[in-house]
Structures are given as structure tokens and as C-alpha cells.
């Protein structure tokens, strides 16, 4: 197939549906199973980044339409076909039966109680517990008194074990958590039970935004939890304040940031710097259907508005095993140009991006069929930085390794929070307060976090260009 630009004209196939879905409130009419499966195969055949590794996606796999439809008829559902067309190592491509739910997730909207947490197995034991990472303001969890650092080991009275089905246990519209605490490194039950309800919430990507200063230095601290295209103005405003206040250093906290919109990651990297306009940020490598494309550092957002840039030559980035995709691309994209001091633990290792593929003639959202609301979110590209760095399957290794101590998480933004303190000490920032007292350390293996069952979990997505 002749290569074409992905974002020019994708008139590669016209599916059999002709009705349009310009209005989200339009009634969805039942689709024929074969037509649904055809949409899945066509979308994956055109876009899937690993198409060459899937024999059933080869352009010459079927001699005619009858052969293709006979193959499609073997699969009882679009989900079954989609799974069949993925490579064994693909953890991130998904299919959804209602693209409106996916769109909400990508914009930070979901039914939630506002408690962000991780589930951990203590090293060399069968003890499992949850720990609260942070709480969304004005959420049910915040109103119930849940705070960062709280430990819980039961949900609805069910004690956690390595075999617990956490997805099922935590999926209800409401549940209760039973608090526990560490005493000399031992996990001890308390009598405190907190009931939590879920409502529709929109998470603000900027969780903490502050300036830490003394007589000689100003350090900006930004805890950023997701790259959301609908919150670009808030991010630019935060950097506008950093510029106005004249900060000398920046600590960017991405430890709980699983990724999101790639263009927002480029903009954030451009705000941190500013002196590399037009320089290569990354190359987008597609399958053989499309030419590779480049992404450059910029001085404007997608609306054409100027970015507030710091022109820094060094940035500190805090990471954890939950740091993924667009977060990793900020690190990777900046590495060839500035001193990136990474503090924490290895990141996830996600360097591929996806788009939402709708059932329309050009696979865009406009004019999507009324026959169903399915959409695909397949991996369509790999990203390579200006130095050729990619394929970091084991994550990006920190310069200063420091695992979160679950018995002493600290307060986000406080100078004695362990990861932030490590950054300030490396900067040479004079700290008035002494280091906090030592706690019996508690470390463990992260089993899952609260976002793991969400549609936007650790995904990096791009848009069709206009």
C-alpha cells in the first residue's frame, strides 16, 4: 500500500453504514454483528502499529470480500475479534462499546469517590493493603475525611489477600474501607470504618501548585496527575505564575500520572524550556501504511495562544511505577536538551500512542454511524526522541532511586515529603526544618492502583489533525 500522511485524507475504505451520529443524543440502532466485526478489522488493518506482526491483518490475507466475511463470522463479538488481532505483548489497545464513556474518561470525567490509592503487597509476605495517594477536593472521599497516607486492609469487611479480586470488590457504587496502621513495621487493624459513595467527578490535572522559597531561591512545585487536552489553559496559567514569580528551579511531580494527551505533553515540555522552538521533540513512527511524522517543541498551544515558558536548563521529575506514557515522553523528549534529574523509581515503560477510531468513512468522530456506539483505541505509533531513544519496555531508570515508604508518605508539597525533599536537597535548597524522624520503613510491590480498570489507564493518545 502506498504510504500516506495519517492526518491528511483517510479515504481508504467506506464502510457499509451511512447514517450519521453528529448528535450524541441520537438514538443508536442495533448493528449487524458482521458489520461490527468488519469495522473492527478495517480499523485495525489501517491503523494498528503492530499490523506487520498479525498475519490476519495482512493486506493480502483475504482474496476477496467473501473470504474476509467468512473469517469475520468466526468471531461471536467485536471484542473477541479485537483481542484476536492484538499482539501478545499489547496491554494498552482497547475496544469500547460506548465511545461517549471513553471520551469522558479521556477528559477526566468518571463515576468515582475521589480516593486515589494503590494496593500493595508487603515484600516477602502475603500481607496486602491499600494506601491513599491523594484525595480529590470536594469529593465524597474528602467529605468523609479520607487523607493521603491512610492505610486500609479491608473493603466491605473483606480482608485483602494476594488472591483478592480487587476489581470486583471495588467496582460497586459504594463500599466501606477499614483502616489499619503500621506499628513498628507491623500492620495493625483499627476500629475505624469509612463509607464511600461514588458520584460523577471531573479531576483537575493540577493537584498541587506552589512555590517554595527562601532568601536565595524560588522552587516551583507542580503535582500533575493527567495530560488532559481540556485543561490546557489551567496548565499554561500555572506556568504563567511561575514565570511571574521568577522561579529558579522546577520540581514536576509525575509519580501518579499515567499519561494522556501527547500534545499536552509537548506543550508542558515547551513550557519547562522555551528555548528550543522548532527543535525535534519526537518522531512518530507508524505502520507501513503511513509516513513517519515529527513533533517539534512549540511556543503556542493548539489554539494558537502563546505558552508561558521558563527557559530552564534543568528540571527535577518525580516518578513511580505508576508514571507512564505521556509522562514518560516528557522525560524522554527533554533528555536530549536539558538536565533531567529523575527521582523515585522506574517508570512503566510505555512509548506508544493511540487514537480513537470511530465507525465512519474516515474513522473520525464526525459522521460516525448511528448503528452502534463502538469505538477502537488501538496503539498506532511508537515515539522516538531526538537521540533515537525508544523501546524502554522496562521503564526509565531514575537518577536518584527512592521508593515511597508506605509508613511515611508525607504531605504532598511539604518540604519534608521524602521525594520532594530529595529534590530540594539535590538542588542545594536550604531547608529550615530538620529532616523528619525516621520511621520503620515499609516497602512492597504495587499490585494495582485505582485507575487500573479505567479506560484511560496509562494511555497516551493523539488527535486527528483538522
Regions found by a protein language model. Name each.
Residues 1-7:
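Bacterial N-terminal signal peptides that target proteins for export
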Residues 3, 105-108, 167-169, 212-213, ...:
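A general structural signal for short secondary-structure junctions and capping/turn motifs
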Residues 9-13:
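Hydrophobic helical h-region of N-terminal Sec-dependent signal peptides
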Residues 15-19:
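C-terminal motif of bacterial Sec signal peptides marking the signal peptidase cleavage site
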Residues 21-249, 441-466:
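Flexible, low-complexity junctional segments that flank or bridge functional domains
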Residues 221-222, 230-237, 242, 249, ...:
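C-terminal "post-core" interaction segments
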Residues 255:
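Active-site beta-strand/loop signature of hydrolases that rely on acidic residues for catalysis
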Amino acid at each position: 500500500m502506498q504510504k500516506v500522511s495519517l492526518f491528511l485524507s483517510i479515504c481508504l475504505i467506506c464502510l457499509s453504514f451511512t447514517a450519521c451520529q453528529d448528535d450524541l443524543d441520537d438514538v443508536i440502532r442495533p448493528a449487524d454483528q458482521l458489520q461490527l466485526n468488519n469495522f473492527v478489522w478495517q480499523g485495525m488493518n489501517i491503523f494498528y502499529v503492530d499490523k506487520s506482526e498479525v498475519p490476519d491483518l495482512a493486506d493480502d490475507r483475504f482474496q476477496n470480500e467473501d473470504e474476509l466475511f467468512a473469517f469475520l463470522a468466526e468471531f461471536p463479538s467485536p471484542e473477541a475479534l479485537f483481542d484476536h488481532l492484538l499482539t501478545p505483548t499489547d496491554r494498552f489497545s482497547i475496544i469500547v462499546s460506548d465511545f461517549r464513556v471513553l471520551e469522558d474518561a479521556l477528559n477526566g470525567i468518571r463515576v468515582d469517590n475521589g480516593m486515589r490509592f494503590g494496593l500493595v503487597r508487603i515484600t516477602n509476605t502475603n500481607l496486602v493493603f491499600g494506601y491513599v495517594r491523594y484525595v480529590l477536593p470536594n469529593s465524597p472521599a474528602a467529605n468523609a475525611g479520607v487523607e493521603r497516607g491512610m492505610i486500609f486492609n479491608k473493603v466491605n469487611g473483606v480482608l485483602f489477600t494476594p488472591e483478592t479480586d480487587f476489581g470486583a470488590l471495588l467496582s460497586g457504587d459504594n463500599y466501606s474501607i477499614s483502616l489499619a496502621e503500621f506499628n513498628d513495621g507491623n500492620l495493625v487493624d483499627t476500629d475505624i470504618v469509612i463509607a464511600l459513595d461514588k458520584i460523577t467527578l471531573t479531576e483537575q490535572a493540577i493537584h498541587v501548585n506552589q512555590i517554595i522559597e527562601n532568601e536565595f531561591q524560588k522552587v516551583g512545585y507542580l503535582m500533575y496527575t493527567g495530560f488532559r487536552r481540556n485543561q490546557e489553559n489551567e496548565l499554561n496559567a500555572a506556568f504563567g505564575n511561575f514565570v511571574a514569580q521568577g522561579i529558579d528551579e522546577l520540581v514536576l511531580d509525575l509519580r501518579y500520572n499515567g499519561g494522556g494527551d501527547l500534545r499536552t505533553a509537548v506543550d508542558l515540555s515547551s513550557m519547562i524550556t522555551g528555548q528550543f522552538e522548532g527543535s525535534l521533540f519526537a518522531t512518530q513512527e507508524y505502520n507501513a501504511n503511513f509516513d513517519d511524522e515529527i513533533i517539534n517543541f512549540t511556543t503556542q498551544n493548539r489554539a494558537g495562544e502563546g505558552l508561558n515558558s521558563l527557559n530552564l536548563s534543568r528540571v527535577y521529575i518525580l516518578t513511580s511505577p505508576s508514571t507512564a506514557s505521556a509522562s514518560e515522553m516528557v522525560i524522554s523528549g527533554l533528555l536530549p536538551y536539558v538536565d533531567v534529574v529523575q527521582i523515585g523509581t522506574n517508570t512503566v515503560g510505555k512509548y506508544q500512542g493511540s487514537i480513537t477510531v470511530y465507525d465512519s468513512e474516515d474513522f473520525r468522530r464526525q459522521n460516525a454511524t448511528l448503528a452502534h456506539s463502538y469505538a477502537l483505541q488501538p496503539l498506532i505509533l511508537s515515539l522516538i526522541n531526538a537521540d533515537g531513544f525508544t523501546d524502554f519496555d522496562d521503564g526509565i531508570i531514575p537518577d536518584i532511586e527512592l521508593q515511597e515508604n508506605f509508613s511515611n508518605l508525607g504531605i504532598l508539597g511539604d518540604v519534608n515529603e521524602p521525594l520532594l525533599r530529595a529534590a530540594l536537597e539535590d538542588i542545594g535548597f536550604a531547608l529550615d526544618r530538620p529532616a523528619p524522624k525516621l520511621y520503620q520503613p515499609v516497602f512492597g510491590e504495587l499490585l494495582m492502583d485505582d485507575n487500573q480498570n479505567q479506560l484511560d489507564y496509562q494511555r497516551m493518545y493523539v488527535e486527528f489533525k483538522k
